[in-house]
Amino acid sequence: MDDNKKKALAAALGQIERQFGKGAVMRMGDHDRQAIPAISTGSLGLDIALGIGGLPKGRIVEIYGPESSGKTTLTLSVIAQAQKMGATCAFVDAEHALDPEYAGKLGVNVDDLLVSQPDTGEQALEITDMLVRSNAIDVIVVDSVAALVPKAEIEGEMGDMHVGLQARLMSQALRKITGNIKNANCLVIFINQIRMKIGVMFGSPETTTGGNALKFYASVRLDIRRTGAVKEGDEVVGSETRVKVVKNKVAPPFRQAEFQILYGKGIYLNGEIVDLAVLHGFVEKSGAWYSYQGSKIGQGKANSAKFLADNPEICKALEKQIRDKLLTPGVDTKAVGSREAVAADDMSEADVDI
């Protein structure tokens, strides 16, 4: 850059700092690059598929899927993991359906969890914004976007038409709170439901509620589905779950993770650790027997997972080995989940910002 341009730039930067404050414009090279802080999801496979070890702080995340697919369970698992790190969490229960007893079984400290059950969508989003601006909250879950009913719709008659009200509400709210979320380094998770578009001939007819604003403002979008049942004999004790990372602005997108959710217990982490440890050679499998460092730890996956539950030090050591190997920059995370075909709508929004 020639001297005249340097002088002009210095004058402009000086004027900007005087008018808007120091740090309004910064040179990227003047500061060390720092890894984006993340909060674990409670699923080792999903943490690895996300590329940074969990959900990013200071960002908006959308989790959507069909009914009974595990959306609320996954968010409660995130809250439980955050609380273990000493974080303060809030749950905005717009659906008025949070079960404290179930949350406690998943490891959530319900005594310290802040809960709000707002009457209208405007109230829910205003409460969310105020909690973010307090700079004292680390994780906020909004359950769900579909239940954020505008005040005009609640006060109107049952058959009244309110076209686009919820979409406008979400768009306005997200414009307002996005900057605050970054400044507060707070993770905000929106749970969303699926609807069907009428008359779609080609492509997926599925869409999410609340308009398109959330799709663009979200740094991470997770599509969670129930793929099967977990049985003990004839009794169904849980569900097989698949999560696709359909948008990721902090790591490569389109990874997927598969894990089990056990009823009344949550994500089956020890089972995941056994599977991944075998896949990457940390645990040896011979027939039905599993061995770790030359010693047998159990016959069958269930017994091996029970051994890890009874020996938390070995469990933590195995988990650390897996994380160190798969979350090292440059390591291909396809070992956990492959790239999956996603809807064209998701492809168009999946910006990558590494």
UniProtKB/Swiss-Prot annotation:
Q: Where does ATP bind?
A: G65, P66, E67, S68, S69, G70, K71, T72
Q: What GO CC annotations are associated with the protein?
A: cytosol
| GO molecular function terms noted in the UniProt entry | ATP binding; ATP hydrolysis activity; ATP-dependent DNA damage sensor activity; damaged DNA binding; single-stranded DNA binding
Enumerate the subcellular locations listed in this protein's record, separating them with semicolons: Cytoplasm
Which coarse location class describes where this protein primarily resides?
cytoplasm
- One short Pfam name that applies is RecA_C
Cited SMART domains: AAA
Which key words tag this protein in UniProt? Answer: ATP-binding, Cytoplasm, DNA damage, DNA recombination, DNA repair, DNA-binding, Nucleotide-binding, SOS response
Per the record, the GO terms for biological process are: DNA recombination; DNA repair; SOS response
PANTHER family assigned: MITOCHONDRIAL DNA REPAIR PROTEIN RECA HOMOLOG-RELATED, RECA
Annotated family: Belongs to the RecA family.
Q: What is this protein called?
A: Protein RecA
Tell me what gene encodes this.
Answer: recA
